[in-house]
A protein has these predicted regions:
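Flexible, compositionally biased loop and terminal segments
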Residues: 1-176
Length: 176
């Protein structure tokens, strides 16, 4: 079981809003932001799809959730982070600068979701202004899919190993 929290999607979200960040990746043939063209982004989307296809083909069940909040809800959450001392650590002044780029981020999210949703790795867009409701929706999706895995069970011991369990216990008790 694993959880990717944004991770490889940062490569087609934050870096599209701030292409100058890509220069710090020291990629071949990218020496300035002018080198970052549409083909560059299409390659990144393809790489994400290839990675997720590999995971799916090797038995990984992929769930991708976009926790969509409104701009007003984001404002309220930022205010809570500032007002509640226990949440202060979540705030950065940079959040205010990034908030000014809301529309650009929304366009990038939409593009990334459209270009990386596949049969083996679909996106679920979760309305998330209400945290509890959003969590319930995510849990119900997970439950619905995972209920299909009724044959999950621990592996069976080979008969010879099972027949000798007491022998192995005795050996370990001797201190070997």
């Amino acid at each position: 079981f694993g959880v990717f929290n944004r991770t490889h999607y940062e490569n087609v979200l934050v870096t599209r809003v701030h292409p100058e960040y890509i220069l710090g990746e020291y990629l071949p043939d990218i020496t300035s932001t002018e080198d970052i063209d549409d083909a560059f982004w299409e390659r990144r989307f393809r790489q994400i799809n290839d990675f997720e296809r590999h995971l799916a083909e090797t038995g990984t069940q992929i769930f991708k959730f976009f926790m969509h909040i409104s701009k007003e809800e984001q404002r309220q959450r930022l205010l809570r982070r500032l007002r509640l001392p226990r949440k202060n650590w979540k705030f950065s002044p940079a959040d205010l600068d990034e908030r000014e780029l809301w529309d650009t981020y929304q366009e990038c999210y939409q593009d990334a979701i459209q270009k990386t949703t596949t049969d083996h790795a679909p996106w679920y867009i979760i309305p998330s202004d209400n945290k509890e409701g959003a969590r319930l929706i995510v849990a119900s999706i997970l439950l619905q899919v995972l209920e299909g895995f009724r044959d999950i069970r621990e592996p069976e011991l080979e008969p010879e190993v099972k027949a000798n369990l007491n022998k192995y216990i005795k050996e370990l008790k001797k201190g070997k």
